[in-house]
Each structure stands twice: as structure tokens, then as C-alpha cells.
């Protein structure tokens, strides 16, 4: 590992670019690890490791021992792998800049801030808004059984610190560091060469919002204390990144599987990217089948809900402020499930100054902060009803869907709430715990197998992933979903992609099967490219709204996309290049 390179990339966000980590390979038949090894060796040589993942015996993770491939080479090799007999799909894996660091012509706020402008000095305002204390008093009256007792939350993040607000509830010996591959997930607050990181101790403030005991555990410089939603819950720290700038999708996937195998009941993921990734989806499915409730951040200052929050199996959380208004940086869209406090929420923070560690409680902002609070509510629900009893009654894999349904049914709409934008509304912990459990035969629970089909992969040839990425630009924002409008909006997107990929609309599904994954990758990791296509789509949408008398065929004719194609031609694989020229 080149620690100096890592340090430079982390310290200077402008230097960040996707970094190759390996491949995801899906085979047609189960139990073919030896065949995968043969394919990889024949194609690339001996320095590759093959590991079977998931429950189907058809999915494999392939990693390289030494050299690192360029993005272009990785995609070229993925097409080589796909062409081999028996291979259903091959997808390159990358560590990617986190979506809330990307420039989409928006101005992100600093995550942790001391500004007193519009600052709510009541450190428990977020808990009061979610009616957490009412839930405690009604459903956890025994002082010897604190709210959330018996529940374990897995936290893939930057690791733990010994902050007094969290340390008593951290299961240190159960943790794992996926950066160093050892059992100590401690957040070192700096990159390997000693460079201090922007937004340090991210894992500390997400931990504190879940399980900090009530009130200050010591005197802090701010003079404040704080309280977590489920102070009886324990946390497994899983260190997957140095800072919330560069996300290893491979590390996150491994951490999710590790949590499922090591006793976690809930997962809180305050990380995400714009990449639909089969390796990550495999891990999500693996955990969901074992009954883990997975909660993830919708994203900050991006025009779509990031993954893994966008997966159907995951509860996607966007954020609001103390006035019950949506926070301006919150991602929004149809994939959002619920809203929770995220703007100037008080949480624990650990800093390193001149080699000395300093602990404090400060306000922070971002969907990273609403996510662990909803995970805390999940812990309260499991603790109150008894997870073992829920498994006995429903089976493990239905628990996440039952909770998601009850959570959404218990939400409260707020003044600026819009359907298909902010989920069901602001979460209400008291209502969640008061809600009756469904009958075994209820049809309101989404069957796990059905949920897996609701967001098909790009290689199916469908538009879903692109419709998701450009939901804000393409789809009509009216409050009621109009079927004919959706058809027309899909037609516009289809026409634009067909022109971009130099094909007809009828042949577009086949073209997307061939190169759609690579196109989506560049759109998610290149802000300039995304912006160019978004503007073309938005312009087309505006034109069609002004000229209602045009026919559907005329209104769906896209703007010129030559500039988008020119950007793509600079970097793409040889296979993709032939489809663009």
C-alpha cells in the first residue's frame, strides 16, 4: 500500500479519483470457483485471488495482489471476463470519492460546525422531535433495562475513539479494521503518514447518536452533553475508510457481511456513492436474509439518493431541521423512506491537536447524522418486541420489511412535505413502538424475493438506474404520479441515451446491456459529465413543457449530446469507445 499516495488523496479532495479494487463475477451455474480461477488466470495471470461470496454459490469477488489497474484497463478487462463461457456478468470494483464531496454546482456545508447562527442550543431537540423520550417512558420503564438493551448495531465507518460518550457501548473485541485487516477498528484520526484528515472521527459522532448515555459523561469545552436514541444498545465498530471522502465499496461490502456473521441486528451506514454495484448489493441481500435492519444515508448535496440507501432492502433516510423543515442539502427522491433530524444535531466529536486527543460535544449537519438516529429507533423496536420472538413469529428475513412498513406508517408529514421526495415524513419513535405487529399473513409486508426485483441491474437493459440518477432533471415533480407523464418522461430519457450511445430507441436495451454499467459509472464519478447530461435533459424537459402541442415523438427528441460524448471518449474502455464513435 502506498501510504503517501493515500494521504495525498485524502488530504486534497481535488486529487481524488476512482481507484480499482477488484472484480465482481457472476456465473451461470453454482459451485464454479475453480472455473472462475481458471478464467481469471487465463485472462490476466496468476496474481489474482478468487473468493466465493453470497448465498447462491454463483457470485465471486476477484482481487489483485500487486499492481493497480487504471479505470480504463479495469473496464477493458471486465469486458474480457464477460465474454468467457459461463460468465453472466463481470463488474469492476472501485474505491470512489463520496458523493457528498462531489461538485454538482452546489455548496456543501462543513459537516461539523460551531456556528451559532440558527443553532438550537437544546442538545436534545432532535430526540424530542422524534418523541424518543415518550417512547422510553412508555416502553422501557425498568431503569435496569435501558432503551435498546440486548441489541447490537453494526457501524461501517471510520472506526471508534475512546470518547466518553460512546466507549462504554463499543464492542471493541468484536470490531474489525478493513483498512489494516486486523481486529482493532480504532479511528487514528489521521492518514497513515500522519496527515490530519478533514472531518475526523466521523464514526464517533454517528456512534454517539445511537447509544450515548443520557447527559454529559464528563465536562467538555462546549459545556454541553448529549444523548443517544438507544443508550442500551451496543455497537460493533467496522473501520472501512480513513475519512468520509474516499469510500471503498469492497470494504463496505465486506463489513456488511462481517456484521451479519458476527451478531449484529441493525446496520447504520452513513456512507454512500452514486454507483449501483452488484458486489455491494450481494452483501446487502446477505445481511437482509439474516434479519438485519439496514439504515443508510440518502446523501448530501446530490440530486439523487445514493447507494446503498437506494436499494429496496435499505431504509433511506433524508434530513430535516429543528423547525421540521427539510434541510437544504438533503438528497430527495422516490427512494427516500423517511426523514429525521440532521441539521445542527448535537453529537460527540474527537479531535487530535498537536498530538493530544480532545473530546467534545458539538453540533453537526448532514444525512450522516439522521441515519444513526433511525438505526437507534430500530434498536428500540427490536429490544421492546424481542428480536428472538420476532424471528420465531415471522422468520428472520421478513423482520427488516416489517420494521420498514411500521416505521413509514408511523411518520408525520411536515409543512413542506412532498410525496415521492421526503419519504413518509418525520419519524416518530413513540408511534413505532406503539404500533401493533402485523398478522403473519398480512399482505402489507413486501416479500424479500419481490423486493429484489424492484431495482433491476443495468445489464438487464432497463432504464431504472439512469432514471434514478436523473430523477430530479427528467421526471415531473407534480405531487400525484401521473402514468402518462411517467411514460413521456421515460421516453425523453430513452431518446437521450439512445442518441448518446449512437443507437435507436428500440435497440437501446441491448446497448445498455453491453455498456450501460460503464456509462453509469462515469456519470456517478465525473461531476462535469453528469452536469452536462443533466442540463441537456433538463433543457429538453423545459422545452417540452412549453410546447405542449408537440407530439410525443417530437417532444422526446433530445438535445445535442456531442459534448457529453466528447468527455466520455477521453477515458472510456475500447469496447465503449466503439459504441460512441
Regions found by a protein language model. Name each.
Residues 86, 165, 313-316:
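Glycine-centered tight turns that cap/initiate beta-strands
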Residues 238-241, 342-422:
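Hydrolase catalytic cores
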Residues 142, 147, 213, 237-313, ...:
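Substrate-binding/access-modulating region of protease and related hydrolase catalytic domains
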Residues 24, 91, 152-155, 234-239, ...:
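Structural recognition of the beta-strand scaffold that forms the well-ordered cores
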